[in-house]
Amino acid sequence: MNKVKVENIVSPGSTRLVDAEKYGAMKRAYLAVVPKSAPGATPAQMLERMLENLPQDLFPGGAKAGWWAKCVQLDLEAKGIVKRAKGSPVRLHQ
C-alpha cells in the first residue's frame, strides 16, 4: 500500500502517512466541489456533493468518507489551497 504524507493546519509541523489511493480519490472529489470564492460551503454541504464522485471500491456506500474528507480539508488548508471564511459556521473555499 502506497502512502502519502499529509499536514494538519490544527497541528503545524505535524504530518501523518495515509493511504495514497484513498487520499487521492478524496482530494479529487473535494477539489471538484469546493467553491472557488468566499463565502464558500460548509464541510457537510461539500461531503454531500462529494459522495456521488467517490469510487465505490474505495468508499463503499460512503464508508469512512467523513474522516477522509476532514483529512483532505486539513491538509489542503495547511498547504494554503483551501481557505476558511471568517465567522461561523465553518465555510471553505479556494
Across the structure, where does each feature detected by a protein language model lie?
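Short amphipathic alpha-helical interface segments
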Residues: 22-56
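Short, positively charged loop/turn segments that connect secondary-structure elements
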Residues: 51-70
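Short, cationic-aromatic polyanion-contact patches
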Residues: 87-94
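Long, low-complexity, charged/polar intrinsically disordered regions in eukaryotic proteins
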Residues: 1-32
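A short, conserved structural fragment
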Residues: 73, 77-87
